[in-house]
Amino acid sequence: MLTEIPETIQTPAKPQSIWKIFVVFLLGALCFLVTQILTRVPLLGWLEKQTKFLLWAMSYPLFTGILIAMSAGISEESGRFAFKSLAIKPTKSQFWEPVVFGLGHGLCEAVWLLSPIWAMAGLLEPGQIVLAVVERLIAIAMHIGFSVMVWNGFQLDQRLRYLFLTILAHGLVNALIPLAGKFGLG
């Protein structure tokens, strides 16, 4: 059941060394860099140069938008899963770990996406900047939540189930963007 809280999360956390917290934070940021900047974004860039893909995307814009949204969920959540499996031990962990990992992931994404906005801040209305920052704060909270979901799969020994559910949740959240555009809400 998704509402179960694993025993290891219920126990009070032992004081963690700043170093371990910092490493988990950096691994979260690295996960974003690997799954998005070094992998998904270049693949999407290559794909949009393909004539057949462009024709297909223009024929089915909403479906294409939803598929691209789902690709973010697949990419990022598979990355979280791989980092937890390969780089962050033990399998059972304290609650702070996915929170710090998600914070690293989300802040790295925020810096990457907000940097161009800061570069042209003088040209924007204050409300536009506030809106961008609020959107990123919500996204950071979502990244923390997605990390907790993936980690719960490890805690409950239901890794693939939780990976699938997290990919689905992430994809559905991202699919709201093309859906909002389709209905004039974007």
Locate predicted features.
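Hydrophobic alpha-helical segments at protein termini of multi-pass membrane proteins
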Residues: M1-G186
